[in-house]
Amino acid sequence: GPEHLNFVFLDFKGGSAFRKLERLPHTVGSVCDLDLAHAVRALRALEAELTRREQLSAAVHASDIRDMVNPPPRLIVVIDEFHALKDQLPDYVNRLVRIASLGRSLGMYLIACTQNPMGQVSADMKANMSVSICLRVRDRLQSCELLGDGRAADLSPAMPGAAFCNDSEQVTAFRCATARDIDAVCRQIAFASRFVGSPPQPSLFTAPLPRHVKDRTVADHAPQRIRFGLADDGINLREATVSLTGGNIGVIGPQGRGKTTLLKTLARHASMADGLAVRVSSPHRRVWSSQWLHGGRCTPYASSDAPPPPHIVWFVDDADELFDPFRTDEQALSFTHALADESVSVVFAVSTIRPIRIPEHCNTRIVFPCGERTSDLMAGVPARLLDMKIGRAHV
């Protein structure tokens, strides 16, 4: 069952060979498109899974997965068009060699498929692959590469599926069976898995961040963590959350990157959480206006006789000028006082990090890269994220 055996399918030429197999309950990852970013995530996930299994094995002092009382599922990684991987992502081939060399004792097995094996599989990888299968080929050298002789070139084209298997001890002839109705097979396997109560297996990796993310209402409106988008760790996506009761939050980035949209999203979700009073302020032609929100709508909360909630969240857009130490107007003084008030969390947007001179001004920074390498690095954006698309940020 899926709790004992998992599959990862990787097709690096965008074919549809594995697309139907994605529905198998055993499948924990699949790449069937031409998106190299998706492929890189899959390879990173396999490395992370190998490391995780090494740690599990070391924790119980087991040299082989078979020695573990509760071993992880055996994982079969099937790579179609292996030569395309080598051409497009050559730096990752050596990492696959590591999986091939260390994975067997940890329950990870690699099946690499290619139309032309000549020069595609390195000597290190061959040394860790105990079985070679060769179907009909046109060139005897291709057969020699896998079988040691040219017999696969002599197979008749009238016998599709005929092949030879070299298991390092002998070469055996066989014929592959054809699965004609993959959809029906997958449906029956999925039904059987549900019938016996096999638990669903978590995915090893997800697709990259989508271009657009729809705003969704927060399910529980918990004031501790407000969900506002998707976070990406390079392998998996998860819900991005931020605490509105743990200190001030600075949203940093140039105009047009998404700061105002983010503030509006956070303010709307916060206004639907219990125990928070939400105030929103923004300048218009150098005149500041403020309003209170409750349930996503404006409310005269500030003028009400009801006691205030235990915590206030103040959203301030375009707050650069409020950091000017020479300003003494009411808005600037209120802003400065709120930054130091533990009963108030200020979520402010500024165009650069320069106004934030005191670390206590914000415990959390959400930075939209501006495109200037030095400025982005100073703002805390990792070098690998400097080329992020507009609308994406680093927390």
Regions found by a protein language model. Give the residues of each.
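Conserved P-loop NTPase motor module
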Residues: K86-Q88, A127, G161-H269, N363-I366, ...
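Conserved SF2 helicase motif VI
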Residues: L146-A152, A379-R384
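P-loop NTPase catalytic phosphate-binding loop
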Residues: G1-A62, D67-E145, D154-S156, D220-G371
